[in-house]
Amino acid sequence: MNYHGLVKRLDLPAGWMAPAELEYDDIRARAISRADNDDDVRGINASIELIRRTRGGSWPTGPVSTDFNYVDEVWHECEFREGDSFTYAVYDSRGHYLGCCYLYPVGRRTPLTEELLEYDVDVSWWVTPGAYERGYYTKLYVALRHWIESAFPFMKAHYSNAEIPELPG
């Protein structure tokens, strides 16, 4: 079957609400909102090449403006509220911006294929260069795995980043 352009919607229990805040070790994630715009714009614009290398894909195509990103964050807020996808701004426990993580329907970010049908969420993330140097890329991956298992109703997550960290045995 040709799945080109199809998206497998998130299958959420009736009445289930995604957590607005998540914590793991010294990582704090909160549902992204317009209040995160300045941090997010600075983070994206400082991280373009790192995002492309680690998360993969073609976004961002270049620096983002405050106005453009504001519209994007309003869209993420609406998607979160409707349960269509979940985007989080990520900070450390001291309030320093680290990056973002995304829980999307399979097929939105990565083209849907027969092999991907078994997954019920597409998980991706990125961190700023400073956060990457301090090991937060791997730490956020560990946190995401924990949150998917403990805070979300997903049975099988597809971690779609181009660079997937190796976890200690």
Where are the regions that the model predicts?
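GNAT-family acyltransferases
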Residues: 1-130, 143-169
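Glycine-centered recognition micro-motifs in short, flexible terminal segments and loops
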Residues: 131-139
